[in-house]
């Protein structure tokens, strides 16, 4: 009897070892092949974006700064300004202009050269009387700061000269001409009785399309509402480049407030 048990144990032990080793092998994932490694690496690169910070300035009781987010190949994804929550309190009781530079990556990949942030404490009657509430004018300029500051007041011919047909959106109408800013263009559905919480204003100078300007009221920006809207585009563009087709307003989980341009398309 003992011999039989010993004989069974002799064969049972190797069998158990084989079963244990087999089970252990099943617990390990299969090795990644060179082909799947390359494919996974490529997929990772496709989803990779880089954000570059521009100027940071004091606004109200907080700060604001510019930024650009690009793909790994340098294609612009989002360009804009971000405000800390404190920046929306302690603002001046009179109008206040600010200037912020973009990171050089933005200058290389978009037509925009600098951002002019305008705080309008009591609103203003123009364009077309729709902006009487306290708001921010966020102008993305396609010209240098020096060129912009040299824009003369009307009746100088250069500020009154309009772009050729097709170089501004067909559903925008020309409006106020302001020194150091240029000629404003507003959507043609505005009326003097319209009260605007947010929209897109465009600009021109000396026959050229020179800025895009999301306008957002203080109350809208502070509310944390999310907005993402397309805006009308010209039929033609004087210079090749990546131009945005949407403006966005939103708030993140850290209570930072954003006004940005996205959906860049090569023109």
Spans of model-derived segments:
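Residue-level detector of alpha-helical transmembrane segments in integral membrane proteins
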Residues: 6-7, 162
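Bacterial Sec-dependent N-terminal signal peptides
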Residues: 1-5, 11-48
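Metal-centered catalytic cores of metalloenzymes
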Residues: 28-267
């Amino acid at each position: 009897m003992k011999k039989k048990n010993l004989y069974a144990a002799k064969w049972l032990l190797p069998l158990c070892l084989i079963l244990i080793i087999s089970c252990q092998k099943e617990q390990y994932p299969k090795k990644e092949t060179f082909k799947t490694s390359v494919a996974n690496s490529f997929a990772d690169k496709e989803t990779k974006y880089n954000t570059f910070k521009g100027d940071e300035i004091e606004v109200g009781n907080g700060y604001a700064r510019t930024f650009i987010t690009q793909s790994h190949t340098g294609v612009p994804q989002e360009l804009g300004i971000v405000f800390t929550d404190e920046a929306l309190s302690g603002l001046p009781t009179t109008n206040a202009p600010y200037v912020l530079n973009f990171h050089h990556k933005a200058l290389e990949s978009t037509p925009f050269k600098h951002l002019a942030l305008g705080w309008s404490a009591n609103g203003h009657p123009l364009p077309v009387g729709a902006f009487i509430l306290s708001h921010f004018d966020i102008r993305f300029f396609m010209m240098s700061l020096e060129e912009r500051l040299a824009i003369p007041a009307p009746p100088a011919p250069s500020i009154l000269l309009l772009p050729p047909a097709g170089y501004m959106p067909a559903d925008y109408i020309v409006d106020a001409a302001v020194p150091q800013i240029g000629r404003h263009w507003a959507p043609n559905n505005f009326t003097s009785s319209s009260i605007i919480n947010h929209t897109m204003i465009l600009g021109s100078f000396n026959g050229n399309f020179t800025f895009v300007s999301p306008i957002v009221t203080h109350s809208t920006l502070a509310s944390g509402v999310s907005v993402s809207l397309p805006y009308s585009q010209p039929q033609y563009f004087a210079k090749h480049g990546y131009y945005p087709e949407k403006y966005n307003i939103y708030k993140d989980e850290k209570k930072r407030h954003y006004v940005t341009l996205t959906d860049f398309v090569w023109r």
